[in-house]
Amino acid sequence: MLALPPPYRLRPMTVADIPAVLAVDRASFPTPATEQLFVNELTDNQLAHYQVLLRDAAGGETLVGFAGFWLIAGEIHISTIAVSPAERGRGRGEWLLLNLLLLACAL
């Protein structure tokens, strides 16, 4: 996993992250994903690998981005990358992409 400067960190996405993921997704895409899509990806799709980008702040962590890929026959298909509007233009999407590539190489 990619090492990030504080206050940021990456970790695997969980079902508990879905409400925050949907908020970033809605702010990022004209046709946002559904809750059920992410539930299925995290619980039923053995090919799917998703990560979230978190920022520590007073009062707790804030989910500021997410990304995912499918590993199919030794190749990755990047399914999504999204960063909250307040965090855009600062390399956060690049962190997410690089992390996906590192994870895929490790599988």
What kind of feature is each model-predicted range?
Residues L2-Y8, P12-R88, E94-L107:
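Acetyl-CoA-dependent GNAT
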